[in-house]
């Protein structure tokens, strides 16, 4: 098994066949919807909230609402449907979450997407939840995770998952690899490749994305969608608190298993950082799309599928030539 990460890889260009990158199509079909780019903001409290979810859906971007205000989820689904928008929620795996799924069916509140969101997704309780959702809400598209092995992907797909989320602790504010000794931190791209080879359904690469070029690399190694936290932190629309230090504006960004999210210092696997204020998220998404169009032009194609066929080289941490990002 090859072990490498995003900074270890450079994709090799093919002959360009377009006159302008505006000819290039970056759209992706995922579940029942088609989205402008294969990118989704992480379902974290400092990344996504209701106003941003509405904006993303209205503008044909995928989103996954976080699960940290569970009592608001039924009203959120209803509100999105009243706006003729898709509803995409997260659930955990505790007993009351099984009851919650039953209640949604009873109330005929059927979200288009349900993400089962726990740190170690290769577990029997996740399999039980997948099977429960598929039995009670068969029309919902079920995303399960997070995982880091082919065995996990196969098990969750067999249970009925429509997509799996790959990545255990590679994110900027996740310290699972430090606290537990386990995870895909430092070799996330290799883990993605390993898992994608076993997958028969879509894969979401989750974590470790530091640059827009990493999106293209994720597609090359098997991702259908790329979940990103840090690049989406710090915007006007980001729910994180705006703070000022030494005359510079920042927004806070913390992991889903941090004490800042949990409100307690038990089983902490996340940390809090301050991200420089970045302005509008619309500008960031536009730049991502344009950079992805350029990536596809270098791949010699007009669609995302061209990225899957390019050759690559391993350069072992040298692509930045010693420069820090």
UniProtKB/Swiss-Prot annotation:
Enzyme class, UniProt record, top EC level: oxidoreductase
Keywords: NADP, Oxidoreductase
Residues holding NADP(+): 203-226
One record GO biological process: purine nucleotide metabolic process
UniProt cross-references to InterPro entries, sorted A to Z: Aldolase_TIM, GMP_reductase, GuaC_type_2, IMP_DH/GMP_Rdtase_CS, IMP_DH_GMPRt
Molecular functions per Gene Ontology: GMP reductase activity
Reactions accelerated catalytically: IMP + NH4(+) + NADP(+) = GMP + NADPH + 2 H(+)
Stretch forming the signal peptide: none
Coiled-coil ranges (or none): none
Active site: 174
Any one Gene Ontology cellular component term annotated for this protein: cytosol
SUPFAM superfamilies assigned: Inosine monophosphate dehydrogenase (IMPDH)
PANTHER family with a match to the protein in the record: GMP REDUCTASE
Family of the protein in this entry: Belongs to the IMPDH/GMPR family. GuaC type 2 subfamily.
Role summary: Catalyzes the irreversible NADPH-dependent deamination of GMP to IMP. It functions in the conversion of nucleobase, nucleoside and nucleotide derivatives of G to A nucleotides, and in maintaining the intracellular balance of A and G nucleotides.
Protein name: GMP reductase
Protein species of origin: Latilactobacillus sakei subsp. sakei (strain 23K) (Lactobacillus sakei subsp. sakei)
Gene name linked to the record: guaC
């Amino acid at each position: 098994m090859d072990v490498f990460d995003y900074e270890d890889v450079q994709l090799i260009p093919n002959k360009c066949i377009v006159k302008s990158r505006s000819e290039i199509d970056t759209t992706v079909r995922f579940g029942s919807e088609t989205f402008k780019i294969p990118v989704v903001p992480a379902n974290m409290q400092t990344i996504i909230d209701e106003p941003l979810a509405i904006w993303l859906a209205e503008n044909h971007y995928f989103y996954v609402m976080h699960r940290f205000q569970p009592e608001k989820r039924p009203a959120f689904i209803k509100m999105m449907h009243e706006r003729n928008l898709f509803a995409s929620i997260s659930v955990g795996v505790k007993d009351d979450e099984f009851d919650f799924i039953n209640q949604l069916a009873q109330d005929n509140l059927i979200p288009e997407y349900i993400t089962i969101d726990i740190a170690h997704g290769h577990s029997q309780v996740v399999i039980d939840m997948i099977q429960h959702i598929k039995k009670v809400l068969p029309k919902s598209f079920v995303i399960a995770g997070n995982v880091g092995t082919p065995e996990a992907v196969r098990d969750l797909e067999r249970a009925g998952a429509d997509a799996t989320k790959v990545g255990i602790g590679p994110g900027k504010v996740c310290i699972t690899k430090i606290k537990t000794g386990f995870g895909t931190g430092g070799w996330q791209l290799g883990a993605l490749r390993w898992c994608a080879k076993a997958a028969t359904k879509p894969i979401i690469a989750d974590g470790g994305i530091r640059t827009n070029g990493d999106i293209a690399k994720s597609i090359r190694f098997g991702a259908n969608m790329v979940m990103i936290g840090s690049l989406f932190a710090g915007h006007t629309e980001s729910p994180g608190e705006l703070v000022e230090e030494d005359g510079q504006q920042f927004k806070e960004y913390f992991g889903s298993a941090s004490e800042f999210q949990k409100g307690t210092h038990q089983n902490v696997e996340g940390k809090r950082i301050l991200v420089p204020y970045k302005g509008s998220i619309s500008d960031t998404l536009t730049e991502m799309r344009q950079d992805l169009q350029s990536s596809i032009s270098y791949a010699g194609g007009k669609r995302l599928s061209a990225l899957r066929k390019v050759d690559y080289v391993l350069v072992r941490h040298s692509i930045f030539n010693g420069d820090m990002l």
